[in-house]
Amino acid sequence: MTQEKKKFDAEVGKILNLMIHSLYSNKEIFMRELISNASDACDKLRYLSQSHSELVASDSNFKITVKVDKDNWQIIIRDNGIGMNKEDLIDNLGTIARSGTANFLKSLSGDSKKDNMLIGQFGVGFYSSFMVADKVTVTSRKAGEDTVHVWESDGLGEYIVSDSDKEFTRGTEIILHIKKEEDIFLDHFRLKHIVKSYSDHVAVPIYFFDEAGNNEIQLNSASALWTRPKSEITEEQYKEFYKSLSYAVDDPWITMHNKNEGAIEFTNLLFIPSSKTFDLFHPDRKRRVKLYIKRVFISDENIDLIPSYLRFLRGVVDSEDLPLNISRESLQHNSVLEKIKNAITKRVLGELRKKKEESSEEYNKFWANFGGALKEGLCEATTDHEKLLEVCIFRSALHNKMISLDEYIAGFKEEQNTIYYLSGDNPDKLLSSPQIEGLLSKNIDVLLFTDTVDDFWVNVNSEYKGHAIKSATRSDIDVEQTTSQSEDKNTHSKKSDDEYKLLTDYFKETLGKLVKEVKISKKLTSSPACLAVSDSAMDIRMERFLIEQKQITAASAKNLELNPKNKIIEKIFNDLKANNKNNEELVNLIFDQACILEGEPVADTGAFSKRLNDIVQKAIL
């Protein structure tokens, strides 16, 4: 018998160290993980057997068994699934083979309390065995192969892989050598209760040996939960299925269990989590809904079953109309799958619309968790943008709460026809921006966009239900024309741009290429000036993002808008009319201030500091 000793990958070592020294109170999740792995092994072989029936010729009835050997301090879990050969044992148990485990590692903080809580959040598969066992022995024979292999470790840095002469049928057996301090798990009644709680939704029969170790008792109905009538499923069963499926500790916020019996037949059991999923913005943008065909698991990877922007969904979809022998490649551009995807998307958006109307408080929590991902759909060409925008909510500057676009439109002033927004990183900073002071002074609301994706979707969604969506940074905004003629007008006499030509020319001459144009603002009420862009130009925040990503090399020159009602601007204008052109330093300071307020870099920070010091010095002397 050949035997090979190997060291765990460093990443696995970190996990094992945490498992061995775990203070996590809910250690029974090791059974959830091992049952889930055994069920997956059976699902994989069931799928393969559709095209390779010889793999199950000797035993086509899948099952999982659990046994307690109290005398030897052992718990034994056995399945007759696909099994593992030597390479599989090394890859699956000696290295990081699962993205969820890799994400678990990235989330470790070094704080033992926080890290122990992560065990429940992520589930860490097979390695959770070491919370209750000081040694684990895995015996396995892969379907279609004759050799039996044994993997064994105490979790302290090394493991042994060997061939075995043991008589062993297809599948995997895991023996947990239970720690002395964890003897509670050797209690027959307690372990039976734990196994039953984690097995009710599993589609593979799970058998538990009696105390004598002779007779098997089936603990679950072995029917897929989603195939049962809703009236026969309790809320607790839905919750447990969700937690087992998604390795979650939270309860689902929304549960959608539907049977579609139209032109396309399928069943979906989908969940929207109540807490933010750890991998929501992972670069892979993986979707976590499993596809079954006639109760046979097909895949949960690289299948376009739900749109990427709904990747926070967890659950299963079971189709009656797809052939069991379909290849994963054929699923990429499959018309039946596309129809299922469209139906699910419509159903999910309908549920969100209903929830938004029922409870704004609950919906706000959902939006804080998943709104950023949902808005990504507004950038996709195939999305029904209007339906998606109906479930989007944004921060209202006027009311300081989250509102929908329909609520915004319902609050239009008499002659208003435009939806205004301002984008930035911080809502509090946006509220103090000069860009929106004029609009707010006329009780015209402005939506505050703070997600990076906002700057992208507004470029492909210029209107909503016939109303333009416009950035408050645009040069052509006139708050007087936006509001009703019956409203009180500012007592300041309104001078045309021509009357202020002396002023705008002076600013342009002083600032030169630093600005594209200098204009009289029709939206400022108190601030002296602000930066602005023309309707055809890129939004300021979007341009800054592209510079950070090195998509463009330099910022473009912006327009500078002046407020002639501001005392500083008024003084400069009066000086010009008196032929006094000695305000160049003040002009530059006003421009620098406008840049800072917009988050734009100041061209010369040293000169800016000197100008500011000079003006302060003059004021106090």
Swiss-Prot record:
Out of the domains of life, which is the source?
Bacteria
Map out region (C) in residue numbers.
545-621
Stretches for region A: 1-328
Q: Which PROSITE patterns match?
A: HSP90 (PS00298)
Q: Name one GO cellular component term.
A: cytoplasm
Where would you find this protein in the cell?
Cytoplasm
Using the UniProt annotation, give all residue ranges assigned to the region (B): 329-544
Q: Where is this region: Disordered?
A: 475-495
Task: Supply the Pfam families for this chain.
Answer: HATPase_c_3, HSP90
Query: What keyword terms does UniProt attach to this protein?
Result: ATP-binding, Chaperone, Cytoplasm, Nucleotide-binding, Stress response
Family as reported in the entry's similarity comment: Belongs to the heat shock protein 90 family.
**Reported function:** Molecular chaperone. Has ATPase activity.
- Kindly state the subunit structure of this protein: Homodimer.
Q: What is this protein called?
A: Chaperone protein HtpG
Q: Which organism is it from?
A: Rickettsia akari (strain Hartford)
